[in-house]
Amino acid sequence: MSQYQAVKGTRDIFPEEAAQWKHVEEVVHTLASLYGFSEVRTPVFEYTELFQRGIGATTDIVGKEMFTFLPDPGGRSLTLRPEMTAGVMRAALQRNLLSQAPVHKLYYISELFRKERPQAGRQRQFSQFGAELLGVSSPAAVAEVLTFMMQVFETLGLSGLRLRINTLGDLEDRARYREALRSYFQPYEGELDESSKERLEKNPLRILDSKNPALRDMITGAPRLFDFVKAEGVREFEAVLRFLADRGIDYDVDHLLVRGLDYYCHTAFEVQSTALGAQDAIGGGGRYDGLAKELGGGKEMPAVGFAVGMERLLIAMEKQGLFATLNPHGPLVYVVVQQSELADHGMQVAFKLRRSGISTEIDLAARSMKAQMREANRIRSGYALFVGQSELESGQYALKNLVTSEQTTLELQAIIEILREPSIREGLKA
């Protein structure tokens, strides 16, 4: 064993698990295209103040969880991105996207970094997929983003999901609510944990995020943000709920849901999975109209988005047995060379197959025919194509189905035509 190990909070993903990741990513790419979202990629690190201003200085992410570097040569601190929305908004403002078109629909599958205590589904390097709809934040836009997210879960076969949703109102609503919360919690200050005492002073909304079970009754009795939202905000929220009902999407209105990022306004939501236990949130999002202005954009930009944690999603899928039928095949063909002196000819055959768009593997270690067949079965090859002296002389090659054991002998070009048939994988089902 090497003296070097993966850094705490990171992990390696090998081929079998990588196939599961690829399955999820392909579903995301396909549905993003159906909904009209285009992929965006941003740098893995940004100037630290982007996250301080965008996410909020009082959040746990900024206060405790960011990987921050010594200043760059220009003297500015840099941070590995802990979330995507601030970076996407920075990119949109820098490119001046809304001057090119009134609406932009962007999505991503990206690596992120947070200095958290590693546990199942929570790593220091982790992945998310998500979407950002910029330029419009109407109830229909919120429903569009939510429907996209929920259809990803549905397509993957996930069950036992709970969509929690709330309205956070606008800046004025939340300012009045913060004062009401501060007045409510101050008499209980002696019962609060140290983290909540700090939040009481800086941003009492964050107390509602507390996972301390000793505070649950106190939090449950707190004033509802909904009661501080203006009538217009309530009407918009009710319109979102109607859109969800029309699409057959079940939801629970949760007046304690505030999310952990300061840029959210109006509608916010979170999806939980019963398969995950205590750490049950797999995704969430909401509107963030004020983020553009906070990042120096000059004015508010209507925006709404979501993000889903890939690691937690994959754990939930595994627990529900959703990878049992995935069982991906290896290469379609394994070229079995019967005599070592024919290795060059075997390579030529493999080259022709690959140039014809057929996934092909061939032994590179001059192993015995028996060892090659074991390897072909181990990597789940669909067919074995045999290269021997008789094949070289006759131009006829034996092709064996490694699932059914059926075998046929044909010229190489005829074999290529058969293997290029779109339905060829159907013949590999036992």
UniProtKB/Swiss-Prot annotation:
SUPFAM superfamilies the record matches: Class II aaRS ABD-related, Class II aaRS and biotin synthetases
Keyword Nucleotide-binding: yes
InterPro entries reported for this sequence: aa-tRNA-synth_II, aa-tRNA-synth_II/BPL/LPL, Anticodon-bd, Anticodon-bd_dom_sf, His-tRNA-ligase, HisRS-like_core, HisRS/HisZ, HisRS_anticodon
Keywords associated with the record: Aminoacyl-tRNA synthetase, ATP-binding, Cytoplasm, Ligase, Nucleotide-binding, Protein biosynthesis
Gene3D superfamilies assigned: Anticodon-binding domain, Bira Bifunctional Protein, Domain 2
Catalytic activity entry: tRNA(His) + L-histidine + ATP = L-histidyl-tRNA(His) + AMP + diphosphate + H(+)
Enzyme Commission number(s) of this protein: 6.1.1.21
GO cellular component: cytoplasm
Top-level taxon in the UniProt lineage: Bacteria
Compartments, as annotated in UniProt: Cytoplasm
PROSITE patterns linked to this entry: AA_TRNA_LIGASE_II
Gene Ontology annotations of biological process type: histidyl-tRNA aminoacylation
Alphabetized GO MF terms: ATP binding; histidine-tRNA ligase activity
Record carries keyword Aminoacyl-tRNA synthetase: yes
Family matches, as HAMAP family: His_tRNA_synth (MF_00127)
SUBUNIT field: Homodimer.
Family from the record: Belongs to the class-II aminoacyl-tRNA synthetase family.
Protein name per the record: Histidine--tRNA ligase
